[in-house]
Amino acid sequence: RAVQLGPVLDAILPRHDYPEPVAALLAEAMVLTVLLGTALKFEGKFILQTRTNGPVEMLVADFATPRSLRAYASFDAERVAAAEAAGRASPAELLGTGILALTVDQGRHMQRYQGIVQLDGTSLEDAARSYFRQSEQLPTEVRLAVARQLVPGDGAREHWRAGGLLAQFLPEAPERMRLPDLPGGDGDEDVGHDPSVAAGADNHHRRRRLCLGIRHRG
């Protein structure tokens, strides 16, 4: 599954004049929220929230089916500026340690479901992979990409673009038994490992990532 965001980022991110690394981190949270929310095939809200001790203390992204998206970041401006000056403003460094909560809300007459993942100096990508390892125990790859791009014919203005990719093996897929190096795989770490198969899978994922554009659909 792949999702791509464009104008919605331009509509949300400039409202609060976020520093660029904070805006990029919030864009990652937004695309991950839409990626997971649209994968669930439900009606209601999917909410992503972080609470951490890093310069970005909280992220909230709220996706309501079918197409509504809201997001907000709470941060310490001085700590963010210091992190930028020290060259330590990666997503994982801005988050620090804490928790990532993923909530499914299908309305007041339905039970809410929530999953909690520890953030220990990890990125949102890493936390999402940990979530799937804990909850579904399936080999899962999550990739997120965020960038600002100049759009031709628009007065050389920069626009935010983001993309996300979620790839999983089916539970009975034979490749699952042959790829011991994938998180959640069933193969023995030392027996029956064919490097050519693993390399082929890695090339496949790389092609998928390269094919993932960062433009808005719809």
Model-identified regions with their sequence ranges:
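Short, intrinsically disordered C-terminal tails of secreted or membrane-associated proteins
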Residues: 212-216
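Alpha-helix boundary/capping motif
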Residues: 187-195, 203-206
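Interaction interfaces in information-processing and related assembly proteins
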Residues: 1-185, 201
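Short Cys/His-rich Zn2+-coordinating modules
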Residues: 207, 217
